[in-house]
Amino acid sequence: METRRSINERLASNLRFLRINTKVEEPLGKVKYMSQRHLAEFIGSHTQQISKFELGTNQLSASQVYRIAKLFGLPVDKLFDENLPKSVYTKTIKQNIYT
């Protein structure tokens, strides 16, 4: 049986991977990779919380996990998948989703 810690570590690893491989198109057309700030704004959190979660010192709420899955266009259970198809994932999101 998996421990809570191993599940949280997998979620943190997958989230970080998805975030750093997602591009955000800003209003003036500039495209850059998603920052912790972008992600925090979308899920209603703070940059420090995202940083702590990616480091494994904080946990996300169920509603935050749901919003993250929706943002990346994945079913919630895929965020916990140890076989997330990491070699093929790239996505560009328009910044206006944060408003």
What are these regions (language model features)?
Residues M1-K32:
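A short, Lys/Arg-rich alpha-helix, primarily the initiator
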Residues E25-K52:
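Short alpha-helical DNA-recognition segment
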Residues R16, R37, Y66:
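Residues within the helices of the helix-turn-helix
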Residues M1-S6, K70, F80-T99:
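Short, charged recognition helix plus adjacent turn
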